[in-house]
Amino acid sequence: LAELGADTYNIIQVFFETKTKTYAALERLALDSMRMYFSDRCALICITQDMYKRSGSDESETDRIANLPRQIEGVLVGITMRELKDGSYKASVRTHGEIGASSICKRLGGGGHMGAAGCTLYGSKQQAINSLLKEVQAELDSVTID
């Protein structure tokens, strides 16, 4: 595109650096919900339907949020849970190193690959979190962490 005269600066700005106001509001609420587990090796965000309402956002704006928990220094497992309209929870798991996101999610009926995977959880928010944390603990215990 650059060779054809496209304004690459503006393209990058629009596609990679610009956030909608509703996304920024949702991101703030999501980060405020973050909890750390297992000596800060796991960070978990839970986005609720109420957060969508409060931010004016919707599920279409959550893809970039899925990577935020893993970006924190020292975090090996980053989880973003989204409450769906039916009350279930979609979990996106992102991992570093030898920690297998797919191993965590497969045990919960989901799938993916080593560094990124997902699953759907049923029950209350706390039940969903507890199910995820049980599998994260099992995965952390199964690998040697330097």
Where in the sequence are the language-model features?
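Hydrophobic helix-and-loop "lid/oligomerization" segment in the mid-to-C-terminal part
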Residues: 1-107, 112-146
